[in-house]
Every structure is written in C-alpha cells, then in structure tokens.
Amino acid sequence: MTSERYNAREAEPRWQRQWDEKAIFATKNDDPRPKYYVLEMFPYPSGRIHIGHVRNYTLGDVLARFMRAKGFNVLHPMGWDAFGLPAENAAIERKVAPKAWTYDNIAAMKKQLRSIGLSLDWAREFATCDPSYYKHQQKMFLDFMQAGLVEREQRKVNWDPVDMTVLANEQVIDGRGWRSGAVVEQREMNQWVFKITKYSQELLDALDGLDRWPDKVRLMQRNWIGRSEGLLIRFALDPKTVPAGESELKIFTTRPDTLFGAKFMAISADHPLAQAAAAKNPELAAFIAEIKRIGTAQEAIDTAEKQGFDTGIRAVHPFDPSWTLPVYVANFVLMEYGTGAIFGCPAHDQRDLDFVNKYGLGNTPVVCPEGQDPASFVITDTAYDGDGRMINSRFLDGMTIAQAKDEVAKRLESEQRGGSPIGERQVNFRLRDWGISRQRYWGCPIPVIHCATCDVVPVPAGDLPVVLPDDVTFDKPGNALDHHPTWKHVTCPKCGGKATRETDTMDTFVDSSWYFARFTDPWNETAPTTPAVANRMMPVDQYIGGVEHAILHLLYSRFFTRAMKATGHVAMDEPFAGMFTQGMVVHETYQKADGTYVNPADVKIEVGGNGRRAVLTATGEDITIGPIEKMSKSKKNTVDPDDIIESYGADVARWFMLSDSPPDRDVIWSDERVQGAARFVQRLWRLVNESVAASAEAPSSRPANFSADALALRKAAHGALDKVTGGIERLHFNVCLAHIREFANALADVLAKPAKPAPDLAWATREAAGILVQLFSPMMPHLAEECWQVLGHSGLISEASWPQIERDLLVEDSMTLVVQVNGKKRGEVTVASNAQNPEIESAVLALDAVKVALDGKPVRKVIIVPKRIVNVVG
C-alpha cells in the first residue's frame, strides 16, 4: 500500500504531454470503424474560459472518451467563434487591433482548455476569423446567391446615428442605442438576407424526426417558425373616412369564427395606412413617434401598457355593410407579423379585452362554453379562449369553432370585390428571412461589388477570399471599412470600370452555422467541404450547448445545412442528430452592508448552531449571504477555473461538474463539495494501490470457481459496469458517478478484511480494480492513467477498450421484496429470484411481523407486485 498522496499538479501535465506526443485523439477520415461525432458549441475567445466552459466541455469529453473506448472512430474537434463586436469594443477602449486581441485571447484560452485534459483533435482547429475559413463562407454565399437563397432587399431597420450602425430590436432600450444612448431612428436600408422562409414548412416538419433533441428545444423552434392556418380577409374601408388612395385593409386571422365579436381594427405604426393618416394628423404622428421610441423588441411590447390612437378611419364588416369598426394605430401590432393589421375580438383575447376596457369599446362574447347558458354568459375582466359553441353570430350560431371557421372561409371565398375574393385561406409563418448585413469591421466580408453600370456583381471565385484590411482605425463612429482610404475601391470584374466593395459584413451567426461541417475536413483549400468525407462524418451525433441557443443558432444551422445540400456541399438535411442542453453553473452571492458585492474567494463561511454565517476574510465584518444566481462579473460570484485546477487538479473540477446534479440542470457551486471531490480522488488512489497489494499473488488466469466473497465482488464490478455504461449512453452522468462511488465502497469493504485473500478473491480484486479505473477514466482521465500504470498496464488507458460486461453475473440469485399488511410496511422478505407466487406467499405469511400485524385475523388475499411489493390484506 502506498503512503504517497496522488499529486495532480505533477501528473496531469505529464499525461497531457503523452496524449499530445502520441496524437491519440487525432481522427482519421479513412478509418473504417463506425464514426461518432461529438461536438460542444465552440467558444467566443473572450480572453478566459469560465467555469461554465469546464462543465460544457467535460460533458462532451466524457462521451468522446467513452465512445472511443467502445470502438468508434470519434471526431471531437475544437475551434473558435472569433468574429464579433467585443473585439471592436476592445479596439476602441484599449487601442488594440481586433485581430491581435482575438488571437491573443485564443492562445490564452487554448492553454486553459488544454489544462482540463480534453480529448480534442487539435489538428482540426480553426478560428472563424481565419481567412482560410471565411474564404469558403464567401464561396457559399455566392453559391446560395446563384441558387436563389440570397437576396438584397429594402428593410426597415433601427439606426443608431452616433455609432452609425443597425441595431437589433433587442439593442434598442427605451428608444435609445444600447451603447451610445442616442435616439434611434427608423430607416429603410438595403440589407442582404438569406431566404430561410423557403424552408419554413420543411424546418417545421423535420422537427418530428429529431427525437434525440429536448422537447423544450423543439417546441421553442416550432413557436419561432410559427405556422398558423387562417384566413386573409380584405376589409373595405369607409371611403368617407380614409386618406386618398386607400380603399381596403388586409388582415390575416386564425380566428375568423370570431368576426361577429369584432370591436375594433388595429394597425402597426409602420403600416402604410398609419403613415398616410399621420401625414395629416400631427397628434397621430406624435403617437407613432412615441411607439418607435419605445422600440419594437417583443419584450418591450409585452411589458408596455397597451395603447392605441383612433385614426378616424372606419372599416366595414364583411358580413354587414352597415357595421363599421374603428381603426386604431396600436403599440402592440408589429408590421413583421401577418399583414401588420388585426381585428380585435375582446371577449376571446385577453390583450384585446384589456384594450377595449381601456377605451370603452365593449365586448360581445361569440363562443360559449359547453353547458353554459348563452343568455347569461358575459365577459368582464378575463377573456374566454376555450372551446364551445358559437353565439351572437347570426348564421354561425350553434356551430363548433371548427365549423364556424370553415363556414366563414367558404362565404368570404365566394364573395368578390374588384375581381378578387374577399377571403382567402392561407398558411402563415412567424419566421422571417434572415437579415445578415452588419455595419461592422470585424466580420466576414460580403463578397459582392457595387458598380454604377453593372449594379451588384459577385466577386469572382478566383479572387476569394475578400480579406479584411489590418490597417483600420476606429477614431470615427461607424464601420471602419467605410472609412478605409483604399480597401473598398476596386475595379468592376464585369465591365472594368470603377466600383466599390460591399462594406457590410456578415452576421456572426453565419460563421457558426456551418463550422461543424468544416471540421470534417478543414484542410481542403478549394472547397468548404469534401462531400464524401462530410457525408460520412455528418451529422453530428451529439451536440452540446446552452439552451440560450435553442432558437437562432440551431435554426440557422438547420437552414444552412439544407442550403449546403442544395448547392452540393453536403448530402444531409439535419446537422445534429442529438442535441443536449446543459444547465448553468450558479453560485451564492455575497454583499456588504452597503450593497456592494464581494467575491467568494474573499469570504469565509462559518457553520454554527445558528446555521451558516459569512464574514469578510480580511476584516471579519459580517457579509449577507444572498440568493444563488448565475455567475456574473457584476455580482462577483464567479469562480476562476485556473484557481480550481491549480488547487485541486482538473480531474476534481471535472468530477464535481458531473456529480452534483443532472447535467441538464443547474449545478450549484460549492467549495465544500469540491473538497469532497478532492478527497474522493485520494480515496480512489488508495483503493487502487491497496488492490495491487491485495492481488499481488493472484493467478494470471481466471480461476475455474469463485467463492461467495469473490463472486459478490465480481457481481458488484459487472453490475457497476452495466449501470455506468448505460448511464453514459443516456448522458446521466451524475447517476454514473453515484454507481462508481457505490462500487468503490464494495471494493473497499473487501480490502478492509484483514485476512490474506484466497487466489480467487485476489483475482477478482484485480479485475474489480481494473474495471473501477476504466469506469472513472472518462470523467477523471489523468488519475485513471496514473492508476492504470499502477495496475501494471504498459499502454494508455485512453487507448484501452471498454471492458466487456459478463451478463451472467447480472442475474440475481435472490430478490428482496417489501412486505405490507393492509398497506403498511411491516418488513422485507428475501426469496429466490425465480420464486413463484405460492412460494413467495408462504414465505411472507411465515414472517413473525406479519403474524403480529394480522393479530389472528384471516387473510383475505395476498397482492404480489412482481419483484417489488407483497401486500397482505386481512
């Protein structure tokens, strides 16, 4: 038995060097074994990894190591999502070039990732800001353009006049730019868009086949795509009330059955009818300006008070020319959805009800719940959105909702105005085409040229990549490419005249929408992929990342893969066969009396009779223990992975990340549990060394027979092997760790016996120790390598095959059943695993505890739940 402690600080770098020197994690594309592609979402090179990265990449690494041991040709690459705004901010704030800042950060973070002991194929590494990467992205842009999947169109955008850039809706806060604070303007601008809507139905339908994706992620994508079946209705406008040239208002509704409950029409502030009305109404113009000041982010709209302005325009009900509806400009109607106009049926829509209650428009219920008297059914403060029968709806009365929808559609489809039907059944999608133009320097240049004679001209493929210039300055607001004295000035490749480059760059979501395909052959200099290789290695078998990317990144990647298929780069539709969303790492917060946050490293926790107390280590002053929250710099509740690895080793950090909770749930950081993981590492080290001593005289060949003790140990070993194997396959890593601990206890019990083990038990001990080390090797690979050598193996455990389960050892000779009398537990009974019901019944009725509980009463029946419970009813 060794008296030395396991020294992670010495061992971990040594094993990492061996892995690198032997290139054991390098994947060969021509390997004939079945492939397994595991990928974690690649990081943005911000400068340092955080503890959430450790969890994310550990999850993938466990799976990669396991599948490699199972005999798969594992592809487990790493790269950098390297374009983006933070690099430009750093250039402005720190006077450092975005390129230098980015590559310095990559070098620092790569060193950190290596220290975690990840089984990555670093030979495939790239950054999306490498010209050798975005060259192929530009080529695909041109391919997509030729295939009709890229267009240039006028779009209304949020323009920051100080930063001189387009802002996403989410970047407009109270009508001002999130960074500059300038009042945001609405502008019409030419934008490059990917035609993702061409795949709306396909993207929706294919979700049904993604059965290894979380249901919540698929639901989020369904809602984002937002398929709705309804009716497009052309409401006539009262000519006495409308601006010149306006005659009708088109709305799309999924509830045409509620037309007789309509009380108002509402249009977006951007609707042409609103603009026409505002031209002659200063008050309306001011109201529209206020709406635009608040912004059009969905969150802002949802939380803002519902407001409207009566334009004075009146719409005519399609079934009653004498019935007109007021047309409001409302702050909750967006031009991006449907037609930018709705009719409001307040009795059956809560938002509409709140609106009419504010403006005194009243409501008329038109759907009555089954079993309720229509004469007494009224709506006050809560809209009814359930099923029922139609009321107050003339020719629809008595119909179901479905019948009423169909009847309204039939009637309006058959009525004409101006040679076209008043109603038309339509399928609408919430999904909009993907605008990719960004007025930023640090992004992939869009490979087109603008010529006064030839208009938009693609950059010839032979001239790719269009490389970003390094000599840019950020002393002026706006896009540094616009200010560059020479970069944008070129010769038109079509006519030879003077022309200019496109100075917009691509949305960084484009960069991450195909990187997984590039990893299959990043050495191809002439094409984005090598189709034969990509088609063999794709799709990604297991993708791992945060749920915050459930919509945009995953949806864009699904579109991009289809577009790549349409242009001949891959043959599959879906990029990710399996998707796993891990939880966050969270931590307590600590605050001084004045409310300032304190770093956990500066706090000492004391546990006494009154519970936990926090004090500032330096001064001893009391610190308030706040709620457990997501780690953030602002609340100073972060933990530096380097500190943990330096203090305890990477394996301890990995083990803690896997053991505390299911991987799809948040894990609460706890110094105490980290220390517990460190103690367990030392315990495993001792167990392995003790096992070597105990099995020193074990026979080299397997004994013909095993004693009860040896057989029990072998059953524990193979039972743990079976459970951990299944647990890793299901990504139930925390359960796996519990089984490993349980098995370690069983081995420790054997080793604790003072007697020298018989040869069969010594052989079983050696086998058990080997299985134990292999079980924890995906989670704690450095410790496993060290233990593997102690066990006498010459090779690396990272190259060893996963042990075979001996199924006959999983068959239990006996089973223990809970015994109840009249539903109350009275004890347990152990019987043969193949015992029949009469034998079980006899054994149970013979128990003293059962006899006492029955107290002489006759047994009426015995209920046996197989392999679980026996309930005696007396």
Swiss-Prot record:
It catalyses: tRNA(Leu) + L-leucine + ATP = L-leucyl-tRNA(Leu) + AMP + diphosphate. GO terms for biological process: leucyl-tRNA aminoacylation. SUPFAM superfamilies: Anticodon-binding domain of a subclass of class I aminoacyl-tRNA synthetases, Nucleotidylyl transferase, ValRS/IleRS/LeuRS editing domain. It comes from the Bacteria. It is found in: Cytoplasm. A motif ('HIGH' region) lies at residues 43-53. ATP binds at residue 633. It is an enzyme of class 6 (ligase). GO terms for cellular component: cytosol. InterPro entries: aa-tRNA-synth_I_CS, aa-tRNA-synth_Ia, Leu-tRNA-ligase, Leu_tRNA-synth_edit, M/V/L/I-tRNA-synth_anticd-bd, Methionyl/Leucyl_tRNA_Synth, Rossmann-like_a/b/a_fold, tRNAsynth_Ia_anticodon-bd. The keyword Glycosyltransferase does not apply. Keywords: Aminoacyl-tRNA synthetase, ATP-binding, Cytoplasm, Ligase, Nucleotide-binding, Protein biosynthesis. Its EC number is 6.1.1.4. GO terms for molecular function: aminoacyl-tRNA deacylase activity; ATP binding; leucine-tRNA ligase activity. Pfam families: Anticodon_1, tRNA-synt_1, tRNA-synt_1_2, tRNA-synt_1g. NCBIfam families: leuS_bact. Belongs to the class-I aminoacyl-tRNA synthetase family. This is Leucine--tRNA ligase.
